[in-house]
């Protein structure tokens, strides 16, 4: 049975303005990386979901390990700009052919479960949605 809902987690940024050797999504907070916090949040709130991560070459091995640990789709490399990373994520899930796709910037982890549920409800009504 194919999954109708796929989440693309954009975790490919290098955080130029952040000025740190570690990518923002790999910063640890309360024993979990920002990426892990996103994975845990979405798996908890959306039970039937496949998650596709898009990352950069420097974090690829770490993200691959996280994907194995959390039973996610294999990560893909992103582009040098966000829209290219979205494109590569969409290419990666094209073989799954999901009915719904959510795209989330991993470094914006404070989205609420209520917003996610509204987005899914609206998308089922064929309303295209964006949450800032």
Please give the residue ranges for each predicted region.
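Conserved N-terminal catalytic core of the sugar/cofactor nucleotidyltransferase
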Residues: 35-98
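Short, glycine/charged-enriched secondary-structure capping and boundary segments
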Residues: 22-25, 66-69, 90-91, 115-119
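Catalytic tyrosine of NAD(P)H-dependent dehydrogenase/reductases that use a Tyr as the general acid/base
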Residues: 24-28, 78, 101
